[in-house]
Amino acid sequence: MIKVEIDEGSGFCFGVVTAIHKAEEELAKGETLYCLGDIVHNSREVERLKAMGLITINRDEFRQLRNAKVLLRAHGEPPETYQIAHKNNIEIIDATCPVVLRLQKRIKQEFRKEDFEEKQIVIYGKNGHAEVLGLVGQTGGQAIVIESAEEAKKLDFTKSIRLFSQTTKSLDEFQEIVEYIKLHISPDATFEYYDTICRQVANRMPNLREFAATHDLIFFVSGKKSSNGKMLFEECLKVNANSHLIDNEKEIDPTLLRNVKSIGVCGATSTPKWLMEKIHDHIQLLIKD
């Protein structure tokens, strides 16, 4: 008998849960609701909310909008978004994650200090990611984004550095960057770093590694756009080479189910629990066949 188990620690983080709840609440009123960008980096959940009436728009479409209601997702937005909304009489339903909001405020405070010209505000994150765009926006576009310790080489080590992190990045990689900067910063410059990684995300990594290591086969469920999904899937691979990234049940290769005694189903902070349950049930059907 093959055991199939869902990782109880996987699924939406509280920021995403709040954003989806706010969307459902507004849609239940029967009014038109727009969302600036995909509410979550999971196509199946986006499709579910679209069926309920949620209209996803891009930034160009947002700029053309007038007298409407727009949901801002958990990732957060730059100040410009709120300015456009005010100008165009757009009602904002703000679902920015409180962890992201606190980070935005800290970066803005650092940017407004008198000695800004003498230092660099550096953000460890994915270039172009929605959260990172919102963070860089707090500095009027002047923050430097780096994706790795390798990219830290482009920094000016004769100038002081203030380092922040996208909330969903790897704690280990953040520490690597910290050590690299400490090693190369000029004695005349100062270096301060702020561990701004969400603990709900960071704490998942050891638990996920443990879960992946206890099963013969892992199906990691995540949208292909999810930055957090890619990072967590890599953690699964480190402890279990028989880990496979899938977006939905149709991507399961039935031949993988041969000669295994236990299968684990887990996912990213952008993966809905209902989708993992659907995949669990689909695996059970394949096993019976």
Swiss-Prot record:
Keywords for this protein: 4Fe-4S, Iron, Iron-sulfur, Isoprene biosynthesis, Metal-binding, Oxidoreductase
Main enzyme class: oxidoreductase
Active site: 131
InterPro entries: LytB/IspH
Cofactor note: Binds 1 [4Fe-4S] cluster per subunit.
GO BP term (any one): isopentenyl diphosphate biosynthetic process, methylerythritol 4-phosphate pathway
Sites where the protein binds (2E)-4-hydroxy-3-methylbut-2-enyl diphosphate: 41, 75, 129, 167, 226-228, 270
EC code: 1.17.7.4
Organism domain of life: Bacteria
Essential cofactor(s): [4Fe-4S] cluster
Molecular functions per Gene Ontology: 4 iron, 4 sulfur cluster binding; 4-hydroxy-3-methylbut-2-enyl diphosphate reductase activity; metal ion binding
Binding residues annotated for dimethylallyl diphosphate, in chain numbering: 41, 75, 129, 226-228, 270
Matches recorded under CDD domains: lytB_ispH
Coiled-coil annotated residue ranges, if any: none
Function: Catalyzes the conversion of 1-hydroxy-2-methyl-2-(E)-butenyl 4-diphosphate (HMBPP) into a mixture of isopentenyl diphosphate (IPP) and dimethylallyl diphosphate (DMAPP). Acts in the terminal step of the DOXP/MEP pathway for isoprenoid precursor biosynthesis.
Protein name according to UniProt: 4-hydroxy-3-methylbut-2-enyl diphosphate reductase
Species in which this protein is naturally found: Bacteroides thetaiotaomicron (strain ATCC 29148 / DSM 2079 / JCM 5827 / CCUG 10774 / NCTC 10582 / VPI-5482 / E50)
Gene coding for it: ispH
